[in-house]
């Protein structure tokens, strides 16, 4: 099950989130958590991320960000018919243009059953989200990609580095809940 919804948020609310993430005061953390050899990686991977929320608690220095992003859960319910029962994590990811096209390794965000909601902040014509079955979803501003994840299902995914923009911005929600 995969769902793609364009124009997921009303334009005003989307712009508020985008301006918050693109603001120079938004504090990023360097991450190299995808090591060489991870599900076929041939070299170390890195990107910038900001953890907003993890396991039912907001991150202290990200509280204002959490307050801005939290209303998105109402749209998950309204547009996806998805009721969030547990928030595993919410991260904002920034994949930088490194002058070459390269996909990260295939992975599930969590080994157990969960749902992934990838919300795209900007448009990248060269950086789709890829699935092992060969399908891909283009990275388009204000688009939400929603799918089931976990080791129990054949739905591993990967992302590409952008070539046409400075960075690829997305919010990654890992959730448990139910569709109705």
Language model regions located:
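Catalytic core of Fe(II)/2-oxoglutarate
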Residues: 90-92, 105, 111-112, 123-180
């Amino acid at each position: 099950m995969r769902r793609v919804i364009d124009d997921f948020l009303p334009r005003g609310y989307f712009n508020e989130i985008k301006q918050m993430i693109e603001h120079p005061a938004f504090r990023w953390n360097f991450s190299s958590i995808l090591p060489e050899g991870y599900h076929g990686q041939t070299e170390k991977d890195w990107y910038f991320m900001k953890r907003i929320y993890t396991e039912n608690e907001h991150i202290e220095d990200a509280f204002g960000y959490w307050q801005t992003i939290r209303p998105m859960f109402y749209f998950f319910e309204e547009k996806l018919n998805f009721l969030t029962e547990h928030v595993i994590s919410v991260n904002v990811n920034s994949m930088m243009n490194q002058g070459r096209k390269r996909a990260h390794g295939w992975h599930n965000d969590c080994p157990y059953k969960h749902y992934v909601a990838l919300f795209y902040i900007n448009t990248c014509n060269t950086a789709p989200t890829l699935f092992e079955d060969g399908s891909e979803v283009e990275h388009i501003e204000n688009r939400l990609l929603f799918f089931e994840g976990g080791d129990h299902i054949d739905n591993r995914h990967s992302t590409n580095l952008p070539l046409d923009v400075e960075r690829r911005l997305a919010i990654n929600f890992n959730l448990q809940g139910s569709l109705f």
